[in-house]
């Protein structure tokens, strides 16, 4: 809303390209918006819906025709230009809404959950189309979504927000691999990251994460921040993603200092993989294994955590403790 100019900026400066736009009217910011409801004019054809904003600008007729047909070609709408919105499918209507934005050739596209009204299959197809469109236009897209799959698959950079406060700005891979805090860690990834209460204990110069059910030796490279910030002897939260818990004998046999036992409470076969719902002592854990593993309720499994993929979070602030200086989430 602040980028579009619909709400005043309380602090800081907003640039679009090299232009400071804090005090520029919304209509003069050269922004196009696409919403989840397509907001098409029902009495106008696809062509006229796409041309509407250009006609308001008093653009020459031949230039309007050229822009509409170029956008229609990009979006595969050429054969639909004479139809009314009621004769179109949901995906086609959304493409028309995109086309209406494209013909304006804006500096920024603002997209507010544009796919949320579509069914799952169509949403997947449109996700690909919008990504291709972004690559071909080379224009900045700012895309609001609650769907982490859309964020991970489409974004060059993700801004994760909670209650209006930025939690992390990073590439999808870094958001996934190095979350700043427990909110980001739990929000991105399905099934979500496991969070386990542990106490950090030092033995023979090594640091272990321990509780009633497990004792995991931490990777030496992760211990500097724990020691220098006084976490030894304190309770923290251990985070581990389901795919970083291993059942394979070769991994378990080579990870004796990060093994633990757990009982199977439920197995959900997803085809290529199986989600194992486990209990280790009083701790509920989800692991993701190859779908060919046969799991039976009540089985006792010997498992190993990939200690290079373990995350440690402060129990009170929920901020990740890493080698860089421990800091509060930026506000």
Regions found by a protein language model. Give the residues of each.
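Conserved coupling/switch loops of ABC nucleotide-binding domains, chiefly the family-specific signature
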Residues: 10-13, 63, 163, 310
